[in-house]
Design a protein with these regions (language model features):
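Catalytic core of nucleotide-sugar-dependent glycosyltransferases
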Residues: 185-194, 199-227, 238, 242-268
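Membrane-interface aromatic/basic loop that binds lipid-linked glycans or pyrophosphate carriers
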Residues: 218, 247-301
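Short aromatic/hydrophobic "clamp" motif used to bind/position activated sugar donors
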Residues: 64
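Glycine-rich, basic loop-to-helix element that forms the pyrophosphate-binding segment
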Residues: 43-59, 80
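A conserved acidic beta->alpha catalytic loop
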Residues: 17-26, 44
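Acidic helix N-cap motif at the loop->helix transition within catalytic regions
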Residues: 22-30, 72, 76
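Donor-binding/catalytic cores of nucleotide-activated saccharide
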Residues: 48, 69-180, 188-204
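Short, acidic, metal-binding catalytic loop of nucleotide-sugar glycosyltransferases
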Residues: 1-10
Length: 301
């Protein structure tokens, strides 16, 4: 409803039922029967990557937005974003969001938004955009993509991956961008719920992050732009930190993770991995906790 009620109508909506077990199928059919610009596809459950790839294969629009089914688009925001797209013709655009509950109420402030404001409608290259605007927020639904760049470079989601697959997709895409723009527009309401696929870190998620780490490391090695390669390595290092937080609960640390940890320490991908390289384990853990606290405080300043 939040999309249909926008003050803009030059778009298509692709709804895909990935084997839902509730009444979603009937609701989607009703929407498709009522609105000619809605395309509805029903299929067996194959996971988020294959589902999104199917949508990309049939999309017709010049620009691609990804909207999760339980989230919302704020009133009149669609037209504002499209106006910027039309006037600036960027390769990549980022808008902003609030994290909301089931009643659409804000859960907590978006502290990084005020840091991004100074880049509103400023043209940046991909490497600068990663550092100054995205930071560590590689959220698929907060960005707009050009379909021709996606198709020309055959960019697709990693099959079977359900955790950090958006990070990999965005970085693959950014390698082909020269004109990135941030729009200081509150466009998206991201609904935080306990039932979400990413709400609890599972063994499947653990293995997915390792897959994404390997893919990012290869992208960084293959990239011939020095700063872009460093940025990609930094993101890979952040993913490895996420792995490390959960690996202590495992009874057996697998060789693949150990190889990732050694890679991060050898490349000194962040200050945390530098500490891990030189400090004893107990001092390293204290240092990591202090760094994490400092980062949280810095984000709120």
């Amino acid at each position: 409803n939040s999309i249909i009620q926008q003050n803009f109508d030059g778009y298509e909506i692709i709804l895909i039922d990935d084997g839902s077990r509730d009444n979603s199928n009937n609701i989607c059919k009703q929407y498709a029967a009522t609105y000619p610009h809605i395309i509805f596809i029903e299929k067996e459950n194959e996971g988020v990557a294959i589902t999104r790839n199917k949508a990309l294969n049939i999309a017709h629009g010049e620009y691609i937005f990804f909207i999760d089914s339980d989230d919302i688009v704020y009133p009149e925001s669609f037209g504002k974003v499209v106006s910027i797209l039309t006037n600036t013709q960027p390769d990549f655009l980022r808008y902003d969001f609030n994290t909301i509950d089931i009643h659409d109420a804000n859960l907590y402030p978006n502290h990084l938004r005020k840091k991004r404001k100074k880049y509103h409608c400023m043209v940046l290259n991909a490497a600068d955009f990663m550092q100054k605007v995205i930071k560590n927020e590689y959220y698929l639904c907060m960005h707009v993509f050009r379909r021709d760049i996606i198709d020309k470079n055959n960019i697709r989601f990693l099959d079977g991956c359900t955790y950090n697959e958006d990070t990999l997709f965005i970085i693959q895409y950014l390698q082909h961008c020269s004109k990135c723009i941030y729009a200081d527009i509150l466009f998206y309401g991201y609904r935080k719920c306990d039932e979400a696929v990413t709400a609890h870190f599972t063994e499947k998620h653990y293995n997915d992050v390792k897959r994404v780490y390997r893919a990012l490391s290869k992208l960084a090695t293959d990239n011939n732009k020095i700063q872009m390669g460093k940025n990609i390595q930094r993101v890979a290092g952040e993913l490895a930190l996420h792995l490390h937080k959960h690996v202590s609960a495992k009874q057996h640390i697998d060789k693949e993770y150990q190889d990732i940890e050694n890679d991060c320490k050898q490349k000194a991908l962040s200050i945390e991995w530098n500490f891990k390289r030189w400090l004893p384990e107990n001092l390293c853990n204290i240092a990591w906790e202090l760094i994490n606290l400092i980062k949280k405080i810095a984000n709120r300043l």
